[in-house]
């Protein structure tokens, strides 16, 4: 439904393993000779999904907070979290938020005078956070915010 491309068997394994400890999950997947990468995703889904549900169940989060919680473990853990508990935030993540992209890039920041440094990534991350939260609505607003962030640095 969300176009994640996750093989159905991987989610099925996560469901079967949902009551196991992380060590039990890894041992079980090794006995089944599941490829390491798939096994890591299944184990992460089993261990992270309940925490993700708990995190999203607290105070209302901004869209960027939802993305920050879900992205590192996507798509398996957020999808499995939805199977555990229907969360509107995760529905929004899969239908809209995970596809939010900036219209500016590091090259644009260089044209604004920012040299190569870790600051480029930090500014791009802040711009995406603002865009996710609805504070930026296109290339011009992204460039204006980038100028502001560069001058404040």
Annotate the PLM regions.
Residues 1-86:
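Conserved, hydrophobic alpha-helical core segments of structured domains
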Residues 63, 75-153:
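Charged substrate- and nucleic-acid-binding regions of tRNA-handling and nucleotidyl-transfer enzymes
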């Amino acid at each position: 439904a969300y176009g994640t491309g996750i093989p159905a068997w991987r989610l099925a394994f996560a469901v079967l393993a949902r009551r196991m400890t992380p060590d039990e999950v890894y041992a079980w997947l090794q006995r089944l000779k599941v490829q390491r990468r798939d096994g890591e995703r299944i184990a992460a889904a089993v261990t992270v999904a309940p925490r993700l549900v708990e995190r999203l169940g607290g105070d209302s989060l901004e869209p960027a907070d939802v993305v920050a919680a879900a992205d590192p473990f996507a798509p398996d853990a957020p999808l499995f979290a939805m199977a555990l508990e229907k969360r509107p935030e995760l529905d929004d993540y899969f239908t809209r938020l995970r596809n939010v992209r900036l219209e500016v890039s590091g090259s644009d920041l260089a044209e604004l005078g920012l040299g190569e440094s870790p600051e480029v990534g930090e500014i791009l991350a802040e711009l995406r956070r603002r865009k996710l939260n609805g504070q930026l609505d296109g290339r011009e607003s992204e460039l204006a915010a980038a100028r502001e962030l560069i001058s404040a640095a």
